[in-house]
Amino acid sequence: MATNRVFELRNWVYVSAALGLAGCTTVGPDYKQPMAPQVAGYTTQALPAQTAATSGMALGGSQRFVAGQAVSAQWWESFGSAKLNALIEQGLQASPSLAAAQATLRQAQQSYAAQAGSSLYPQVDANLGALRQRTNNSGFGQSGGEHIFDLYNAGVKVSYNLDLFGGNRRALEALAAQADYQRYQLEGARQTLAGNIATAAMAQAQYAAQISATEAILGAQQSQVDIAHKRFTLGAIARGDELSLLTQLEQTRASLPPLRNQLQQTNHLLAVLVGEAPGAATIPQFSLSDFTLPADVPLLVPSELVRQRPDIQASEALLRAANAEYGVAISKSYPQINLSATLGSQALSTSSLFGPGSIIWSLVSQLAQPLFNGGLKAGVNSAQASFDAAAANYQQSVLQGLRNVADVLRALDNGAETLQAQAAANNAAEASLKLVQQQYLLGGLSYLQLLTAQQQAQQTRVNLVAAQARRLTDTAALYQAMGGGWRSNEE
């Protein structure tokens, strides 16, 4: 008999839930994906098919823009540096910022799972209780005096919320979108970390090369000062000429500490990026010769870019969440129906539990319909405003992404031309310095002309190194601007 009642109650709850779901509707608008950017290119002026080339110059090769080329998930490997590859992999494994992003993603996923478990399925709870009580019949005008008895109960309660108007489902949509947002944030953090390590390694190589170039110039200037001192001792030149050359020497020497400081700070940055303390890290030393310049670089069309950039995808996830929250706000104006059933046993002894005459049960259905609640309309309006803000933020993220790509593409094109010009300037400055030094030693030119030639040679050499490094960092920035290829791991 008790078993039959269990089946009856269980079937009643499941059938009621099934009937409720069959008649469910989901209030609020269904999400519609925004249109892709309706533009063919990133800049008003068409890009050349490839960048300028500087023959005979390291990192001076031409780069070809390949339309539609997929971005590799390990795009940093295109620079051909095993040291860089190892450092980035170390950072991806050990970075605390990535660990925090991963934990936040797990939190969002578990929030969704918790809500799904309580919204989609009936809740089943078991209870077991024991009571010992004394009563005094004389207090009720009855004979018999006091009476002590035990009461035991055990039972199961099943409850279910009929989501007739989809409020729970919209809430799940919002939580799923929030989990997606955190997933895209994690992917964005990975790409940012890889990009920061790559550009920091390239900056380290740049500063090291500029220090080396400056030290070479410093050595040449020291030789000129030594010669000038001998000539002054012999009375061939005035003391002022010697002091002018010495001033130039010390000015060149003074430019070294700032470069060393930049190099050291870059090493500290690299240590933190790979999850180590600056004082305990062993950071590899990079040179510009450690890197190769990719000959082919990807160029996605704008309509595909929005799918590839994690920041744009994260912004769209927030838009989906806002759309779902709008549906949740609307659903609060509709009836809420809750069903519950209880089956149990109550007896004066444990041996009598679930015996004849001990079974108790209940069936309950509750309907709540808001009749007057001034806050509901305001809640809907608030959710609508939140959706409008999310839509505007999404459009802004798309525009920022397009601008980012446009800036990097122009930087690549102009950077190649800059290197070409800097290489020519450096060749001319070095040739001029050699000629001026020879003529100065022969007495044909003044020390002022020598100083000018030295200054030009120093500055053009430093600028040349910066232009070489800039081609590397601009290329890394393009890979990031194109989304970093993170979807390659998904697909």
Regions found by a protein language model. Give the residues of each.
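Periplasmic alpha-helical coiled-coil/stalk elements that build and connect Gram-negative outer-membrane
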Residues: 168, 177, 184-301, 411, ...
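Terminal intrinsically disordered/low-complexity segments used for targeting and assembly
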Residues: 2-93, 152, 176, 260-307, ...
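Small/polar, glycine/serine/threonine/aspartate-rich low-complexity segments that form flexible
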Residues: 63-79, 130-157, 280-298, 327, ...
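Sec/SRP-type N-terminal targeting helices
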Residues: 99-100, 162-190, 240, 244, ...
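A short glycine-centered flexible hinge/capping loop motif at secondary-structure junctions
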Residues: 232-236, 440-444, 481-485
